[in-house]
């Protein structure tokens, strides 16, 4: 597998993003619009992207939910005995482990986790997520204040190593269930 440091591998790096939406207008109108926003988002309608070993789907983002301009949440699914990219970013993140077991490495230190645990990645930490379970993928809810960091132009994010480009044996046809 050839990896290039500047390789733009994922669609989310290619698409146009809204980093900060315009904040202008009458307070009464903005407040009315805020009250009209849905408070429940049906994530089953959002497809998973990625693969073949790590999949992601956005749940809440400034692009999809104007009520939430400073937070985002997504679900990551990583197949057994695999891992995500080794990377770092300026924003902190909280990972709630929904299913499976695995470990993270944060700035060289290993931390084991399993379903029901929460894992915190601090600001500026170089980290990587691993799915250790032999039979079940790791399913993780990720919550970040990344939009707020982007607003303050704290844009640094870098991949050190990409995830595997080939599926793990026995998981060649895996797709997360919606």
Language-model segments: which ranges?
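A short, N-terminal "cap"/entry segment at the start of jelly-roll beta-barrel domains
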Residues: 1-69, 156-178
């Amino acid at each position: 597998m050839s990896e290039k440091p500047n390789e733009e591998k994922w669609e989310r790096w290619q698409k146009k993003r809204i980093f900060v939406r315009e904040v202008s207008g009458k307070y009464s109108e903005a407040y009315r619009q805020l009250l009209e926003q849905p408070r429940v988002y049906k994530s089953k309608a959002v497809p998973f992207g990625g693969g073949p070993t790590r999949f992601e789907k956005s749940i809440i983002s400034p692009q999809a939910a104007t009520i939430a301009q400073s937070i985002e949440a997504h679900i990551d699914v990583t197949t057994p005995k695999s891992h995500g990219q080794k990377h770092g970013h300026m924003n902190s993140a909280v990972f709630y482990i929904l299913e499976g077991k695995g470990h993270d490495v944060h700035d060289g230190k290993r931390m084991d986790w399993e379903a029901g645990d929460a894992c915190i990645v601090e600001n500026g930490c170089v980290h990587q997520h691993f799915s250790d379970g032999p039979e079940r993928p790791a399913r993780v809810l990720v919550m970040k204040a990344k939009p707020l960091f982007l607003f303050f132009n704290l844009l640094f994010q870098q991949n050190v190593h990409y995830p595997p480009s080939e599926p793990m044996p026995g998981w060649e046809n895996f797709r997360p269930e919606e």
